[in-house]
Regions:
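Glycine-rich beta-to-alpha transition loops that act as phosphate-gripper elements at the mouths
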Residues: 74-78, 131-140, 159-161
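Active-site-adjacent beta->alpha loops and helix N-cap segments on the catalytic face
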Residues: 37-58, 108-119
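Glycine-rich phosphate-binding active-site loops on the catalytic face of alpha/beta enzymes
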Residues: 103, 151-168
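Catalytic cores of alpha/beta
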Residues: 13-19, 82-87, 136-153
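Glycine-rich, positively charged N-terminal anion/phosphate-binding segment
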Residues: 1-23
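Hydrophobic faces of well-ordered beta-strands that scaffold small-molecule active sites
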Residues: 1-5, 28, 70-74, 101, ...
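Alpha/beta enzyme core
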Residues: 18-28, 58-108, 116-125
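Conserved small/polar residues in nucleotide/adenosyl-binding loops
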Residues: 190-194
Length: 194
């Protein structure tokens, strides 16, 4: 389990990191990807991506916590996909264990299509282990992304598991289950939980 924080200022970053670190956690994920208007409207989550100076200020305290591994989840930007390109140089200077980049803007939320061209621009410049996020719903989707971006460290499945709960099992076993197999596995799982 890796806790996630959603800070809006350096002080809030410290407060949240102290609280989570005080519970013994040594890995913390920083959320700059939440697209929901009530969060983004407060310049948090993906809403902060419009403000590079705020991003720099919020992430600066990473250096104060050498005992904690920080990772970052983010989107291409809030309004347009070029916003992440303004941040990549800053992010490359920070001590991050990984970055998970959702290939949509915050304004898109989960609508429209991921922008793979914009993702590629970030992918080519990012010096941290990078993970792809966005519309991974099948084994074929995973293969296509890993083929196009061979230096990725992996993909985040996220919501894809809601529509295809066996997706991780399919990926691990490198096989796509037939509908009958899906039903059989689901029934077996249901009996285990009963």
């Amino acid at each position: 389990l890796i806790p996630q924080i959603l800070p809006g200022s350096a002080d809030e970053f410290r407060l949240l990191t102290d609280a989570v670190g005080g519970k013994g956690y040594r890995q913390i994920d920083i959320n700059l990807g939440c697209p929901f208007p009530m969060i983004a409207g407060k310049h948090k989550g993906a809403g902060m991506l419009l403000y590079p100076a705020q991003v720099a200020e919020v992430l600066a305290p990473i250096a104060e916590y050498p005992e904690i591994q920080f990772s970052l989840k983010m989107r291409l930007g809030w309004e347009n996909a070029s916003e992440c390109m303004v941040l990549v140089e800053l992010l490359n200077t920070l001590r991050l264990s990984r970055i998970a980049l959702h290939a949509r803007t915050g304004k898109q939320q989960y609508k429209g299509h991921p922008d793979l061209e914009a993702f590629q621009g970030f992918y080519e410049l990012c010096q941290h282990p990078l993970y792809y996020n966005g519309d991974i719903e099948s084994l074929s989707d995973i293969r296509q992304i890993l083929t196009r971006f061979p230096l990725l460290k992996g993909v985040f499945i996220g919501r894809g598991l809601l529509s295809s709960p066996l997706l991780a099992k399919e990926f691990k076993g490198n096989e796509t289950f037939l509908p009958e197999q899906r039903m059989s596995i689901s029934v077996s799982y249901t009996h285990l939980r009963a």
